[in-house]
Amino acid sequence: MISEATQALFCDVFGQPELFEGLNRVTRRVVAWPFGAGARVLAHSAVVVAEQTLLERLRSLPSGGGALEISEAGWTIVASRPLPRSSAEKHFGDRIARAIAVTLADGADRSACYVESLDDGWLFLLPDSATTGWLLAVGGESESLLDRSRLLGGQLAEVRSVGAEFRAYPRIAWPLCGPAWLACGTGALAFDPLCGDGSGNAVREAILAAAVVRAVARGGNPDELLAHYRTRLLAGFHRHLQVCRQYYLGGGSSAWWAEQLEWLHKGLAWCETELASAPAARYQLRGFDVQRIG
């Protein structure tokens, strides 16, 4: 699910105002949170698109013409695992998400997504067409969570298939960069799907990464520029943990929710320690370029 702000970012960066045309739109968010609370209906604005579909749309865009000149790379951009030997993953959680393909009930609202907390996890239903959708189940066994749902029973006709499991907790590569390399996208950060805007964050990281490499190529101080990159991404990760904390504080009062909060508190403490020793800001991003302040 891609928010309105992130849609605008994609369209601006790629110069394609119609990039998200024809996709299923979500205009309402139905929330039963914390555990035991009644449902609330909130205004929302997002589109639902599979990663592969978005990649295919981006790859079909005009390239601008002309042959590309290929030369030996001076930098390594780590966009996925494995990380360089000098870097390791810091993780703050252990919860697993299961992606479940579902058929929507005849009376289901295709323009709404549904979020519900239970005593040992949470559910997130996302329609992706007039008849189908995806259910994310995090925490307890997916069948048990769905059986106990007070919100989703009337929205589903059947479970079509249970897809892959994936890690649903915040993670960061540390350090994020070094001499002639930097991590970006999923190689750098991973967000909780409940609270994060992973695709938008990846675009912003890519803009900053390209700007830093370009600034170094123009004669900028590589140590200062890499420190700026590292600090900006770390600050963004810290903000994500703060948002997660607000959600998980209100999710429930069971041991499962307490454990998730403990992980988040560890992550916040680690981030704050690292940020306290970070150098003062010397650069800022202006458009697609990093410029020295002052």
Write out the residue ranges for each language-model feature.
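Predominantly flavin-linked oxidoreductase catalytic cores and closely associated redox partners
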Residues: R59-S161, E165-A173, L189
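A structure-centric signal for secondary-structure junctions around beta-strands
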Residues: V26, T132, G178-P179
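Conserved N-terminal helical subregion
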Residues: A8-A101
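Tryptophan-centric aromatic hotspots in well-structured domains and transmembrane helices
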Residues: W33, V47, W75, W122-L123, ...
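FAD/FMN-dependent oxidoreductases across multiple families
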Residues: E141-A227
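N-terminal glycine-rich phosphate-binding loop and ensuing alpha1 helix
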Residues: M1-L9
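C-terminal helical "tail/cap" subdomain of flavin- and related membrane-associated enzymes
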Residues: R214-G294
